[in-house]
């Protein structure tokens, strides 16, 4: 067991590796390939992926030491995704790692944690790609955030599988964009998912072998039939997760595919009632590790897990010291060392938002949840919503049909 630095002095944080393996029949490489193909087919993820066709709209400077590009790329059903790429300025002399932010419900590239990640990690010497989830931001018909529009879609399992596939494809195509960037080391790409995003990354990390490391926060606790994830938001989580029943032990298969791909960390607060962590604690994760190792044929590569204390809830923990230290060991931030990370100051996000303009959902900014996040502090400046627009109003009015949920829904319901 490895001890990590505490988020709060009285609360130890731990990260636990897998226990010794019991004898079992592991998946073969051929079976792993077939399972990835079956999962992609189940969610209508195009195989092969389409060309990303990146289109840059503008470049800007969001903070000292950081430059940014606002661009779009192609995803499922010919739709486009608005995105921002944050880069260190100046660029390091050698290629840099990269991190993809996959948002939770109500999240998009405007969300405080997307922006904060962009500035923090870019200053650490990494590229950071953030994007709008379907129905949010510049993928919303009214260009609004925190709408949860995708939850309002009617229909059953087929549309839900299409929706989950869209979210998976969005994330995979973000990786495709990063692989094409000359400044990015394609072997050092990580992906972080928060809340609903943790579900998306759990699936994406199972099927996309280009991703080196995955971080799951506010989730990753995939459970069995009739559990939290089967009963959660039906269109983006519940029905899609139920549709994977053909896998058998869904968590073990998904995480065995992760283990074959690369490192994964699930990190949660023990007080996170949003995704049932109080009943999915250490015993739950240990058992899931054991089952995963049996399918993988080794404890090597099996996911790590860690916890903050019982007064720590639903938060994007990749901004906190223990998870950044884990990421440093996986992708090696170009401007940081582990010693530098250990010495960095921290700031409670509720204090940061009290003194800096930022975009957040007020009901999430509570001490137990996002407001209590103890993020590494590199003097991240505030920002306004429009500073993170990809397009001008005139451009968006002209091009919005390529982005919005209504167009996507029409295309998947009435394919040509």
Q: Residue ranges of each PLM-predicted region?
A:
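Primarily recognizes the serine-hydrolase "nucleophile elbow" in alpha/beta-hydrolase
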Residues: 173-248
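Glycine-rich His-Gly loop
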Residues: 75-77, 101-106, 269
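Positively charged n-region of N-terminal signal peptides that target proteins for export
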Residues: 1-4
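Bacterial Sec-dependent signal peptides at the C-terminal "C-region" and cleavage site
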Residues: 9-25
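Alpha/beta-hydrolase-fold serine-hydrolase catalytic core, especially in secreted/extracellular enzymes
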Residues: 20-69, 74-80, 281, 285-416
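Cap/lid segment of the alpha/beta-hydrolase catalytic domain
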Residues: 94-95, 100-169, 226-228
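Loop/turn elements at helix/coil->beta-strand transitions in domains of secreted/extracellular proteins
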Residues: 95-98, 124-127, 186-188, 209-213, ...
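The feature captures the conserved acid-bearing segment of alpha/beta-hydrolase catalytic domains
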Residues: 224-289, 293
